[in-house]
Regions:
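Serine-hydrolase catalytic machinery in alpha/beta-hydrolase-like enzymes
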Residues: 2-112
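Short alpha-helix in the alpha/beta-hydrolase fold that links the catalytic acid
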Residues: 32-37, 151, 175-185
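Short, conserved loop/helix-junction motifs that constitute active-site signature segments
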Residues: 41-44, 154-160
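Alpha/beta-hydrolase-fold catalytic nucleophile elbow
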Residues: 52-53, 114, 138-141, 166, ...
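Primarily recognizes the serine-hydrolase "nucleophile elbow" in alpha/beta-hydrolase
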Residues: 102, 107-158
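Short, proline-enriched alpha-helix->beta-strand connector loops that line the catalytic pocket
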Residues: 158-163, 189-191
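Short beta-strand/loop motif that positions the catalytic acidic residue
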Residues: 164-167, 171
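C-terminal catalytic histidine-bearing segment of alpha/beta-hydrolase fold enzymes
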Residues: 177-226
Length: 226
């Protein structure tokens, strides 16, 4: 398994926290780089943002066109014919990024796993099955992959990890109903989900960025004091 290439931004020298942030289908690691200064995070702890590039692969729903994708999408609802092998391969690649951050001196408990759309789905997939406690999970405009396996595969270490989920009420790509179903599944399994809705399509909004900023500041502060 080759290591994912990634863009990195450090908010201060020798960061003691990391945010691994996955992009959506067809985008790349540059997609959310410009959001870093908009988050206005506290000067301490210093944070290393890691924006990995998904592998290039053919995507069935797009006529087999090769693009950056964390897994294949085989039908419009993304549920009936999931791509378990693709999801799990990307999970392992993201786990390798977590391991790399740990090797650079960042505790698992100071690492946030985040993502948008497919990237948000992978944030949930990876974090909730990860064997060490993480700082938090941020899942924006996404659904829950391999939902039927989560109860059996959930890691006890992250049963109470803070989860931030947000979705646009006018999202034509991933309908609100799918996101609500994901939230209900998580809540039904006992997870703590902070839920936000915004009047927007499949995108981010200034209001959402403010809420993300506040949530990140909280979980990173908690991680620093633990």
């Amino acid at each position: 398994m080759s290591e994912l290439e990634a863009i990195e931004i450090e908010t201060a020298p020798s960061p003691s926290a990391s945010i691994i942030w996955m992009h959506g289908l067809g985008a790349d690691g540059h997609d959310f780089v410009d959001i870093v200064p908009e988050l206005h995070l506290p000067a301490r702890p210093g944070v290393r943002f890691v924006f990995p590039h998904a592998p290039m692969r053919p995507v069935t729903i797009n006529g087999g066109y090769v693009m950056r994708a964390w897994y294949d999408i085989r039908d419009a609802d993304g549920v009936r014919r999931e791509d378990p092998a693709g999801v799990r391969a990307s999970q392992k690649s993201i786990e390798a990024l977590i391991q790399r951050e740990k090797e650079r001196g960042v505790l698992a408990a100071s690492i946030v796993i985040a993502g948008f759309s497919q990237g948000g789905a992978m944030a949930l997939q990876t974090s909730l099955r990860y064997g060490e406690r993480l700082a938090g999970v941020m899942a924006l405009s996404c659904s829950l992959p391999l939902a039927d396996t989560l109860a059996a595969e959930a890691a006890p270490a992250n049963r109470d990890v803070p989860i931030f989920m947000a979705h646009g009420t006018h999202d034509p790509m991933i309908p609100m109903a799918r996101a609500v179903r994901a939230r209900e599944t998580l809540v039904g399994l006992g997870y703590r989900v902070e839920w936000h809705e915004y009047r927007m399509p499949h995108s981010v909004s200034p209001e959402e960025i403010r809420d993300v900023s506040a949530w990140l500041a909280t979980v990173l502060t908690l991680a620093r004091s633990s």
